[in-house]
Amino acid sequence: MTPEVVKMLVIGLAAGLGFFGPALAFGLIGFSAMQSLGRNPEARGAILTNMILIGALAEAIGIYVLIVCIIMAMVVK
């Protein structure tokens, strides 16, 4: 394998591992929200608001990972 191929494989591995955190966070957010709604259905508005806010923060981490991987791919020549 050439060094360029190895670098691209490393970038792909970094992206895969980097997106694992936000994916896990989204799963836990959804699980916790559904569990909270099951216990207290009247608090739907507050739970939904917090779920969307935390989901946006988790998505930001995924976007940062994507940007870093794109920059790393541009540097490889």
Question: Predicted regions span which residues?
Answer:
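Hydrophobic, small-residue-rich transmembrane alpha-helices and their short perimembrane loops
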Residues: 1-77
